[in-house]
Amino acid sequence: MKRRKWTKEERKRIYQKYKGHCAYCGCKIRIEEMQIDHIVALKRGGADSIENANPACRMCNKYKDTLTLYDFKNWLLAGVIGRLRKLFIFRIAERYGMITVNEWDKKFYFERIKK
């Protein structure tokens, strides 16, 4: 499916969904920097609509790519820390208390702020 160009008004509505934050990591983003992520990827049959669009920072949009929300969450849980722990410098920093790995509540920003 070919992507369409979002209008300024549509971009603004998507941006305001989470008050200028990335829907996934929660970092503050400027509307000019915002990337639009399709919650269900177009390649997976998702609609090219505002309802299927989330504001995303560049990094989250890149790594989520065409993954489902479930698969993206599992990639974060299993992949990131596992890959970091393979790095000698990470293990040293962790051993000496220079960094700590915190437990993640397994919720994206948009899930944490739901009313």
Locations of regions flagged by a protein language model:
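Short, flexible coil/turn micro-motifs enriched in small/turn-prone residues
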Residues: H21, V40-A41, I92
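Short beta-strand-alpha-helix junction that forms the catalytic/metal-binding core
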Residues: R44-Y63
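Activation segment
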Residues: E33, K43, K64-T66
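N-proximal short alpha-helices
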Residues: G26, L42-G45
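Histidine-centered catalytic micro-motifs used for acid/base chemistry in nuclease
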Residues: Q35-I39
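Short cysteine-rich loop/turn motifs with clustered Cys
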Residues: K5-M34, C57
